[in-house]
Design a protein with these regions (language model features):
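Feature recognizes metal-dependent phosphohydrolase scaffolds
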Residues: 3-331
Length: 331
């Protein structure tokens, strides 16, 4: 009887502990019940999450100190710091010459710019169709490789609506009962015959870049001496998965946007020192005409040699008048 009594006490304490735990977690359980209203739904999500954790870790891309250099940023973003070229070599290294692989990588980086150049080399309709076929099949193989780190559901969500079904078939088709080359050849041939090859090539290139990098991390200083930080911001706003750690130059621009006179003067000084003040006028609609008039009135005849802006020959040429106007406002 004593043993039974002790067992009952233990059971009561266990039940009390479980009840207290449920009560303590009730608010969390209530929130979970909104998305997973049944035991089956919760179990299904647990299984899906565990399966997702078994996949290879996605590539994370870190970039820092952009300083408004939009052209360098765009190239590094498009090439994923060499990840794209690595995937091209991994898929085609044994079968395709090095220069052809380099051209294909460049096509993936800049499809809209590179595609017309490569097409122009084809001297006949037959040669163009052959190039379309080879390029589409190679891009499909590369896309299949970069998608291997993701679930099929994730890849489907990344597909463009206009051609998502066909791309899904090309990426995930099974060939137990039919010939792979014949199946691909029929689909690719239909794409070319209907004049959609260019669109599919561009969409495949964009999809490869999307899937090649799972997350982008920006570490500080989007703004500074570079000419177009606004382009960088626009691209980051369209990126599928990015986080940003703001730098000291970014905080200065935020302060300027918030109306701090000190921050406004600092931003003006930096843009004038590097002859980037046109960005303030063209991209942010800030009129510097009044500043220029005041500067000409008080400093127009001064020695401005130490106030001359730093210039980049690649962005020139610069006239003497342009440099003078910038220097006098800088002073």
């Amino acid at each position: 009887m004593a043993d039974c009594g002790r067992e009952n006490v233990v059971m009561e304490e266990t039940m009390r502990t479980e009840t207290d735990e449920i009560r303590d977690n009730l608010k969390y359980l209530t929130l979970l019940s909104r998305d997973y209203p049944s035991q089956a739904a919760a179990a299904s999500e647990i299984i899906s999450t565990q399966a997702l954790l078994k996949l290879p870790k996605g590539t994370e891309h870190f970039m820092s100190d952009l300083h408004g250099e939009n052209e360098a940023f765009v190239h590094i973003l498009n090439s994923a710091s060499g990840v794209i070229r690595e995937k091209v070599d991994q898929v085609l290294g044994d079968t395709v010459p090095k220069n052809t692989r380099a051209e294909l990588a460049t096509l993936i980086y800049y499809p809209n710019e590179k595609l017309p150049q490569l097409k122009a080399r084809c001297t006949s309709e037959e040669a163009l169709d052959q190039w379309y076929t080879e390029t589409l099949l190679r891009l499909i193989d590369i896309c299949r490789l970069v998608s291997s780190k993701h679930t099929r559901d994730h890849v489907r969500r990344c597909l463009p609506a206009s051609c998502g079904y066909i791309l899904d078939e090309l990426l995930h088709a099974h060939f137990e009962d039919h010939d792979k080359d014949l199946y691909y050849g029929q689909i690719v041939g239909s794409i070319i015959e209907n004049g959609r090859a260019d669109r599919f090539i561009v969409r495949l290139c964009e999809l490869i870049k999307h899937l090649a990098v799972d997350k982008l991390h920006i570490v500080g200083d989007l703004f500074d001496r570079g000419p177009r930080p606004d382009i960088i911001l626009d691209l980051l706003m369209r990126h599928h998965n990015v986080d940003i750690q703001w730098g000291n130059h970014d905080v200065v621009w935020m302060g300027a946007a918030a109306g701090s006179p000190i921050c406004i003067c600092t931003v003006l000084k930096t843009t004038l020192a590097y002859h980037n003040h046109g960005m303030l006028e063209d991209c942010y609609g800030i009129n510097l005409r009044h500043l220029q008039r005041m500067a000409e009135q008080f400093y127009g005849n001064d020695d401005l040699s130490i106030w001359m802006p730093h210039t980049d020959a690649a962005r020139g040429p610069y006239t003497r008048g342009m440099l003078h106007r910038c220097a006098v406002m800088h002073k």
